[in-house]
């Protein structure tokens, strides 16, 4: 592949995670997302859907990996990416009453579920999904149904693709006033 003919020299920001501030917005949480292309695409999706913060487990790919930076197409400069003990963060947010949504194969149909305009959307690892420790903090399990409903040819969606679908539905409902 031909590399981009652009170069940027930027200081890597040191960001402090402020959970109380994030409670007023929609936040993406990533549980051990390993593929740099997926992480970059998710950061780009966050930017597209007006999500300013992505909270990652410590085992998630490095957001400043060159493949991640390239996949963000500049969104890495606008979206704040935080790394922390994700299980502890989710447990504290659950205790604070923050809605925590997670994507699972056995959740509620996302298109038939009323979604909050604020809260945390938890997305899991490419191969294992959401870890049991993080899944225990989820307050609402969501499922993206296949179409038609009886079609089950594909086992699951790529994490970045699923994130795009979930973000679109959250924003659709928020703009519709649901």
Question: What is the predicted role of each segment?
Answer:
Residues 101-154:
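Active-site/ligand-binding-proximal alpha/beta "capping" segment
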Residues 14-107:
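RNA substrate-binding interface of SAM-dependent RNA methyltransferases
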């Amino acid at each position: 592949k031909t590399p981009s003919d652009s170069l940027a020299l930027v200081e890597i920001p040191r960001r402090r995670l402020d959970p109380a501030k994030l409670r007023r917005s929609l936040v993406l949480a990533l549980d051990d997302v390993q593929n740099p292309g997926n992480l970059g695409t998710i950061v780009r999706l966050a930017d597209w859907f007006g999500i300013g913060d992505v909270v990652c487990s410590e085992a998630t790919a490095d957001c400043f990996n060159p493949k991640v930076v390239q996949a963000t197409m500049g969104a890495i400069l606008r979206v704040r990416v935080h790394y922390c003990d994700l299980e502890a963060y989710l447990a504290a947010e659950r205790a604070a009453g923050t809605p925590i949504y997670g994507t699972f194969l056995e959740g509620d149909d996302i298109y038939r579920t009323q979604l909050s305009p604020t809260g945390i959307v938890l997305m899991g690892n490419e191969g294992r999904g959401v870890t049991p420790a993080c899944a225990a903090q989820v307050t609402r399990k969501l499922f993206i149904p296949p179409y038609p409903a009886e079609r089950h040819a594909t086992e699951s969606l790529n994490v970045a693709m699923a994130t795009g679908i979930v973000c679109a539905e959250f924003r659709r409902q928020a703009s519709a006033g649901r």
